[in-house]
Amino acid sequence: MYHPRELYPSLGTGYRLGHPQPGADSTFPPALTEGYRYPDLDTSKLDCFLSGIEAAPHTLAAPPPLPLLPSALGPETAPPPPEALHSLPGVSLSLENQELWKEFSAVGTEMIITKAGRRMFPACRVSVTGLDPEARYLFLLDVVPVDGARYRWQGQHWEPSGKAEPRLPDRVYIHPDSPATGAHWMRQPVSFHRVKLTNSTLDPHGHLILHSMHKYQPRIHLVRATQLCSQHWGGVASFRFPETTFISVTAYQNPRITQLKIAANPFAKGFRENGRNCKRERDARVKRKLRGPEPVATEACGSGDTPGGPCDSTLGGDIRDSDPEPAPTPQEAASASAPPCGGPSAEAYLLHPAAFHGAPSHLPARTPSFPEAPDPGRPAPYSAAFLELQPGPGSSAYQTTPSVTPFAPHFIQGAPFPLPYPGPGGYLDMGSKQMY
């Protein structure tokens, strides 16, 4: 092995090799730990340049505490300790309809959930005592899962059938009277009958979102607000009642729950034995629908309880089966001020239903401004041939004089919107000649 001094003589004599320094890394082999000693870099020669640097570093002390920032909402007390945020000493809550809840709980309470939202029955109705009459409180209600299982109805009882679905976003129902004073809450029971349960994850109405076939437990929270504009609360108390546990369903599974709901719910009278929605009535309605509509006998048009006009949806049968009435004479038509039965004739309705939109079908006879001699070779006027709906016996289809028989007014005006009934001596047309 050659020494560097022998390989590079032009660089001059080098520094002699020395033993490893005490601070050298001992992990290297001894042959590689030998280094060169550089006397030009001794510390004694650099003291004039490094006089301000201390040999041993000192640990920095803790910074002084920062001054308190001014509050944006005025003077505010310091937040209470964490243990005080979850306690309201002396406050108690009792379930008003506890006996009803126990009756349902003995069978297994079920609550219907729908996409639109369904109210709970029984509803949570509580009474509170021990509140400060002058302080303000908020009443909240939420529903949380009891366990991590999914249930199914197995003949006579509920049993777990697998793992629960992922928990949905938690929602809280705020009582509409919140915030209110303690005297207001203690004056009467607090009812949460407006709470609605839904299974729609995209519900925009704020209803409580639940999974079907899961067991839930309602919780009631009482929150005291020391200052309405403050971000700190004076205390929170949560209450839960074991008898209010229920299973959410989209249709009742237990027949006994169905009977209990019908018997106890005042809004389910129609589903009782004597109600319109009882099983006997529902089966009868289904049979009637399968048989089809039954014909209803219609009474005479002059009766007092029957509406006058075939457009009434309460009438049955075909209007063409009725006997047509004879055409009135010109004297009777001129003296008549209103059509019989309060509406136009059935023949006019067959031509166009707009005749029954409230327009009169009998108009006074038109008197021409000046007499005209009849022309035997001239065809009958268009108006007489078109307006004649019911020619009398022995008369031809064409007449030389205008007819005064009943007609539908929409034929004259050319649209289904009737003109107002003309006054005495009035006319429907603005000209002085007959229409051709």
UniProtKB/Swiss-Prot annotation:
Biased composition annotated in UniProt, kind: Low complexity: 332-344
Entry GO MF terms: DNA-binding transcription factor activity, RNA polymerase II-specific; RNA polymerase II cis-regulatory region sequence-specific DNA binding; RNA polymerase II-specific DNA-binding transcription factor binding; sequence-specific double-stranded DNA binding
Keyword Zinc-finger in record: no
Species this chain originates from: Rattus norvegicus
Region (Disordered): 67-87, 275-344, 360-383
Protein's name according to its UniProt entry: T-box transcription factor TBX6
Basic and acidic residues bias locations: 275-284
Membrane spanning stretches: none
GO terms, biological process: cell fate specification; mesoderm formation; mesodermal cell fate specification; negative regulation of neuron maturation; negative regulation of neuron projection development; negative regulation of transcription by RNA polymerase II; positive regulation of transcription by RNA polymerase II; regulation of transcription by RNA polymerase II
Record keywords: Developmental protein, DNA-binding, Nucleus, Transcription, Transcription regulation
Role played: T-box transcription factor that plays an essential role in the determination of the fate of axial stem cells: neural vs mesodermal. Acts in part by down-regulating, a specific enhancer (N1) of SOX2, to inhibit neural development. Seems to also play an essential role in left/right axis determination and acts through effects on Notch signaling around the node as well as through an effect on the morphology and motility of the nodal cilia.
InterPro entries to which the protein is assigned, alphabetical: p53-like_TF_DNA-bd_sf, T-box_DNA-bd, T-box_sf, TF_Brachyury, TF_T-box, TF_T-box_CS
Main subcellular location of this protein, as a coarse class: nucleus
Signal peptide region: none
Pfam family, one: T-box
GO cellular component, one term: nucleus
Alphabetized Gene3D superfamilies for the sequence: Transcription factor, T-box
Compartment(s) of residence: Nucleus
DNA-binding region: 100-273
